[in-house]
């Protein structure tokens, strides 16, 4: 299979250097996406005050609840495309691409409708304080108008990841990120649009990245070339995409629902604590992006090797991913803890907001490598096409632990520090369950593979010998 300069051969050669080549652009891309929100927060916090900062930050968990189901489906598209691409099944690859892009378009339109019409009601259910709820609702409504662009970009980038191309999505985000930062400063400082200004800047930047990734697919050669006339919804591809993607999306949605409960608990401390959580949560978002880039690599590498039957190599992929993810998280988490005060000062100059933010970072940053380990095992299983059981275990381990903590322990010991102990506690419990699940399901996958190989050997015709 001929590969262009952007693609990575995931099925041959050494693994670690290819994981780094795949993960590093993906991590930087994720950081740039976070920068869209970070620049929003920094500009609002510095030029519009802590109330506007709380208004923008209080929407994060709620926005994630709305979009993660549909974003999870993009993981299904990534897994299916990687499998067909590695196996050289060009027709199936092309139809996966066109079905995925159509799903993205429909998902984006649905999310735009939901966000615009139900934003304020959802914020009221979260007990968002009266002094920020109108600004929060305005930010959400404008933000959700850009959902079609957001979905199309992410589904398009998922297709490129499937073939090992993480560099071009990075280039697209650099362009859109610079435009986002410039528009933020212009609309907030010059026109004093506050939360509306940062939301408009985000939508415009998402539209630009969407156009760039679709243009890239349109101009590509081979099986993942996009032709708008071929957009379709084919049952044979929707079902396997949903089998992997919907459980992943449900998992993200339910976990973010637990974060909404967490946000509600933070809201009970007032707008200062909300602003501190907003800044601290943005820092944690950068840590998550680093470990999630390795999880994405694990899923794509596993899926391609699964597609060509290289099962032993899948074990090596997981081991190298565990080493890479843990190493990055320990370095970045340790740095975030040691320099937390200085980092939070970028977001706000209010000492009380910084104090609240540091209270959260002090318990969540150093053990963040556990979050990476927790995600890698279900990521490897999704690469094999197994998604439902890891989803159930993640929901039980992560959400169950946090709900018990929020309603059982936290009311007796009300502080931000105690509230956020639920993070590392839920990671440890979930890791134990996911490791057991992985070992059991890996054994089943290997047994099926051995049975197929044995059957092939039996059906081979013996060579005729000369009489």
Over which residues does each language-model region extend?
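Hydrophobic transmembrane alpha-helices of multi-pass small-molecule transporters
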Residues: 65-68, 180-185, 210-214, 286-289, ...
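Short runs within selected transmembrane alpha-helices of multi-pass transporters and secretion channels
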Residues: 74, 143-161, 169-177, 198-213, ...
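Transmembrane helical elements of multi-pass membrane transporters/channels
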Residues: 21-40, 142, 176, 205-209, ...
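Short alpha-helical transmembrane segments in multi-pass integral membrane proteins
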Residues: 1-23, 81-146, 188-246, 302-367, ...
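Hydrophobic alpha-helical transmembrane segments in multi-pass membrane proteins
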Residues: 22, 26-34, 71, 103-112, ...
């Amino acid at each position: 299979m001929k590969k262009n300069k952007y693609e990575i051969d995931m099925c041959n050669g050494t693994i670690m250097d290819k994981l780094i080549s795949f993960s590093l652009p993906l991590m930087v891309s994720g950081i740039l996406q976070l920068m869209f929100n970070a620049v929003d927060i920094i500009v609002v916090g510095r030029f519009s005050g802590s109330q506007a900062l709380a208004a923008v930050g209080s929407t994060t968990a709620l926005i994630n609840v709305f979009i993660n189901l549909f974003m999870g489906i993009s993981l299904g598209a990534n897994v299916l495309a990687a499998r067909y691409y590695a196996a050289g099944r060009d027709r199936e690859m092309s139809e996966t691409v066109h079905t995925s892009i159509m799903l993205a378009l429909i998902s984006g339109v649905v999310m735009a409708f939901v966000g615009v019409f139900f934003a304020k009601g959802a914020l009221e259910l979260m007990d968002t304080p009266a002094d920020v709820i109108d600004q929060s609702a305005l930010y959400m409504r404008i933000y959700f108008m850009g959902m079609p662009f957001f979905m199309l970009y992410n589904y398009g980038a998922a297709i490129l990841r499937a073939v090992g191309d993480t560099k071009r999505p990075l280039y697209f985000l650099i362009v859109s990120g610079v435009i986002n930062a410039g528009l933020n400063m212009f609309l907030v400082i010059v026109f004093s649009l506050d939360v509306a200004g940062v939301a408009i800047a985000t939508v415009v930047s998402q539209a630009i990245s969407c156009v760039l990734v679709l243009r890239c697919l349109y101009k590509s050669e081979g099986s993942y070339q996009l032709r708008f006339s071929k957009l379709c919804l084919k049952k044979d591809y929707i079902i396997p995409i949903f089998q992997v993607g919907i459980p992943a999306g449900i998992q993200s949605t339910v976990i973010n629902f637990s974060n909404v409960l967490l946000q509600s608990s933070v809201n009970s401390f007032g707008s200062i604590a909300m602003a501190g959580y907003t800044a601290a949560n943005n820092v944690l978002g950068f840590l998550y992006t680093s470990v999630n880039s390795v999880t994405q690599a694990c899923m794509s590498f596993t899926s391609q090797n699964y597609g060509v039957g290289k099962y032993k190599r899948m074990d090596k992929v997981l081991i190298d991913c565990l080493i890479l993810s843990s190493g990055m998280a320990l370095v970045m988490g340790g740095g975030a803890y040691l320099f937390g005060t200085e980092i939070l000062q970028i977001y706000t100059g209010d000492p009380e907001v910084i104090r609240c933010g540091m209270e959260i970072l002090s318990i969540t940053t150093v053990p963040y490598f556990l979050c990476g380990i927790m995600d890698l095992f279900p990521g490897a299983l999704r690469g094999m096409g197994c998604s439902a059981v890891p989803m159930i275990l993640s929901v039980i381990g992560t959400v169950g632990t946090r709900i018990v903590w929020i309603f059982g322990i936290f009311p007796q010991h009300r502080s931000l520090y105690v509230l956020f102990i639920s993070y590392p506690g839920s990671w440890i419990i979930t890791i134990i369950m996911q490791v057991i699940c992985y070992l059991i399901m890996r054994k089943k996958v290997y047994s099926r593979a051995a049975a197929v190989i044995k059957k092939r050997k039996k059906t081979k015709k013996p060579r005729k010998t000369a009489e």
